[in-house]
Curated annotation (Swiss-Prot):
Molecular functions (GO terms): haptoglobin binding; heme binding; iron ion binding; organic acid binding; oxygen binding; oxygen carrier activity; peroxidase activity
Subunit note: Heterotetramer of two alpha chains and two beta chains.
Similarity remark: Belongs to the globin family.
Superkingdom, taxonomy of origin: Eukaryota
Cross-referenced InterPro entries: Globin, Globin-like_sf, Globin/Proto, Hemoglobin_a-typ, Hemoglobin_oxygen_transport, Hemoglobin_pi
Alphabetized UniProt keyword annotations: Heme, Iron, Metal-binding, Oxygen transport, Transport
Tissues and organs where the protein is expressed, per its UniProt entry: Red blood cells.
Globin domain residues: 1-90
GO BP annotations, alphabetical order: hydrogen peroxide catabolic process
The protein's name: Hemoglobin subunit alpha-1
Protein's job: Involved in oxygen transport from the lung to the various peripheral tissues.
Entry coiled-coil feature ranges: none
Length: 90
């Protein structure tokens, strides 16, 4: 359970990320691929080269979804239920 202070810290830090979702999201995805190369199998239909438009677009969507979660820290399950349902059906 997050305290109000914890939530404020998360919001402050996330503010920097949400200002440039494509760049931060792509960087996170490339780091995932470096640390866990097997994760690339989930993106086999993507162009995985650096600065790939597909990676940047997918990563921006992830950051946007996480931004919604950060904006709704008091109701995380409600904030991300649509995204959860989408991924459960795929």
């Amino acid at each position: 359970v997050l305290t109000d202070d914890d939530k404020n810290h998360v919001r402050a830090i996330w503010g920097h990320v949400s200002n440039n979702p494509e760049a931060f999201g792509a960087e996170a995805l490339y780091r995932l691929f470096t640390a866990h190369p097997a994760s690339k199998t989930y993106f086999s239909h993507f162009d995985l080269h650096e600065n790939s438009a597909q990676i940047r677009x997918x990563x921006x969507k992830v950051v946007d979804a996480l931004t919604q979660a950060v904006n709704n820290l008091d109701d995380l399950s409600g904030a991300i239920s649509k995204l959860s349902d989408l991924h459960a059906e795929k």
